[in-house]
From Swiss-Prot:
Claim: Lipid biosynthesis is one of the keywords in the record: yes
Keywords: Lipid biosynthesis, Lipid metabolism, Membrane, Phosphoprotein, Steroid biosynthesis, Steroid metabolism, Sterol biosynthesis, Sterol metabolism, Vacuole
Protein's recorded name: Oxysterol-binding protein homolog 5
Family membership noted in the UniProt record: Belongs to the OSBP family.
Residues that hold ergosterol according to the record: Q96
Domain of life: Eukaryota
GO cellular component terms attached to this protein's record: cellular bud neck; cytosol; fungal-type vacuole membrane; membrane
Chain spans, region OSBP-related domain (ORD): 18-371
Organism placement in taxonomy: Eukaryota, Fungi, Dikarya, Ascomycota, Saccharomycotina
Binding site for 7beta-hydroxycholesterol: Q96, R100
UniProt-annotated location(s): Vacuole membrane; Bud neck
Statement: the UniProt record of this protein carries the keyword Disulfide bond: no
Length: 434
């Protein structure tokens, strides 16, 4: 057990979270379990493997078999592209859920972004000029509740991914932290669009001061061409199983996924390690993905001295430095200074009767009941609306992946507001540069 775990501070923290009544995301974390990284930076994990992120865009009606080494007889471009999308999605999971434990020894709580905080950067892909440049924009669009929206786009290959995330947390009797994600991701590859839901997770090892993330539940990847991938996550039990395990099944349509034997492919293994793929009616498996064979490409971010005051690394510079030094008193002092400044700004806005203007994202109403001028109404041909309809996914503000008629869908939830990137706002941006 670590030095912190044996201290009275750790004991006090365990007591506070075990007795806390409400959403734990609103509970301030003690300095010694903080990460020096803001949550706005997590958006970069979606594209840290540029080759895998862009590969689906390189597949066409003539070369699709060349892009499917584990099945040279893949039946169509649509199937090959879905397989490439699934492989890219699996590649993002290790960065999103394991990288901090691997680099810092255990999971740490990221810094909670303030309203209007932004994080931007790019992957120049100099060694692969055919990839072109990929841009990341991340913005904290809400503080109560915390919500981060992001957009990643590569204009050369006509690929983009956007989404937003919000979480609600709680504790079990065994002090396992449960996390329900809200929001979703939309991947656009030329003329195809994919709706991706994110899985619930739980954080174990808290009692022994060595937290780690384990995924549970399922994710959906629904394509505009009708194809569907259902990914089921599981972890290591007391007697059986391996950590970070998953099974993904690919179907021609959502109607077929009620019977697992309809799956065209079964992909299984560990999302943090190696996975294999088996085609329907075949007994031969092939390697699908090995996370150790594809190192991440880090985002290029401007030096802190060149950043806007709202950019994450500049805004949190003093706090992050204190965390790296392990200076508990300085962490508390610098963090409180920043947070008090933000509270003062919110109070000024309240007195003036104004609301903080988001830079690059707008809310869209899928029930068309919101009368605010800042909220747009979703059109009938909206990509999320159409893909959710194919999957029978609830468009309400319920946990990600909730199907129509599911337990959370039946609750009294009267809103269906989701954040969308507005590229015109980015094109008019004159203060923040990549």
């Amino acid at each position: 057990m670590s030095q912190h775990a044996s201290s009275s501070s750790w004991t006090s923290f365990l007591k506070s979270i075990s007795s806390f009544n409400g959403d734990l995301s609103s509970l301030s974390a003690p300095p010694f379990i903080l990460s020096p990284t803001s949550l706005t930076e997590f958006s970069q994990y979606w594209a840290e493997h540029p080759a895998l992120f862009l590969e689906p865009s390189l597949i066409d009606g003539e070369n699709y078999k060349d892009h499917c080494p584990f099945d040279p007889n893949v039946e169509s471009k649509e199937v090959a592209q879905m397989l490439a999308v699934v492989r890219w999605f699996i590649s993002t999971l290790r960065s999103q859920y394991c990288s901090r434990s691997e680099s810092m020894g255990s999971e740490k709580k990221p810094l909670n972004p303030f309203l209007g905080e932004v994080f931007v950067g790019k992957w120049k892909n100099d060694e692969h000029p055919e990839f072109g440049e990929t841009v990341l924009l991340s913005e904290q669009v809400s503080h109560h509740p915390p919500m981060t929206a992001f957009s990643i786009f590569n204009e050369k290959n006509d690929v983009s991914v956007q989404g937003y995330n919000q979480i609600k947390t709680g504790f079990t009797k065994t002090l396992t932290l449960t996390v329900k994600p809200y929001g979703h991701v939309i991947l656009k590859i030329k003329d195809e669009t994919y709706l991706i839901t994110t899985p619930p997770l739980h954080i174990e090892g808290i009692l022994v001061a060595s937290p780690f993330v384990e995924l549970g539940g399922r994710s959906f990847i629904q394509s505009s061409n009708g194809m569907l991938c259902v990914i089921e996550f599981s972890g290591r039990g007391y007697f059986t199983g391996k950590k970070n395990s998953f099974k993904a099944r690919i179907y021609r349509s959502p109607q077929e996924h009620s019977h697992k034997e309809n799956a065209l492919y079964l992909i299984s293994g560990q999302w943090s390690g190696v996975s294999t793929i088996i085609k329907k009616d075949s007994q031969v498996s092939h390697q699908f993905y090995d996370s150790s064979e594809t190192p991440t490409e880090h985002l290029l971010v401007k030096p802190i001295e060149e950043q806007h005051p709202l950019e994450s690394r500049r805004a949190w510079k003093d706090v992050a430095e204190a965390i790296r030094q392990g200076n508990i008193s300085m962490i508390k002092k610098t963090k409180e200074e920043l947070e008090n400044k933000q509270r003062a700004l919110r109070e000024q806005e309240r007195v003036k009767g104004v609301e903080w203007q988001r830079r690059w994202f707008k809310q869209v109403d899928y029930m068309n009941e919101n009368t605010s001028n800042d909220v747009e109404k979703a059109s009938e041909d909206d990509a999320f609306r159409k893909l959710a309809s194919k999957l029978q996914l609830s468009v309400k503000n319920v946990p990600s992946g909730t199907l129509i008629g599911g337990k959370d869908d039946k609750k009294d939830v009267s809103t269906a507001l989701h954040w969308r990137f507005d590229k015109n706002l980015w094109m008019r941006e004159n203060e923040i540069t990549i």
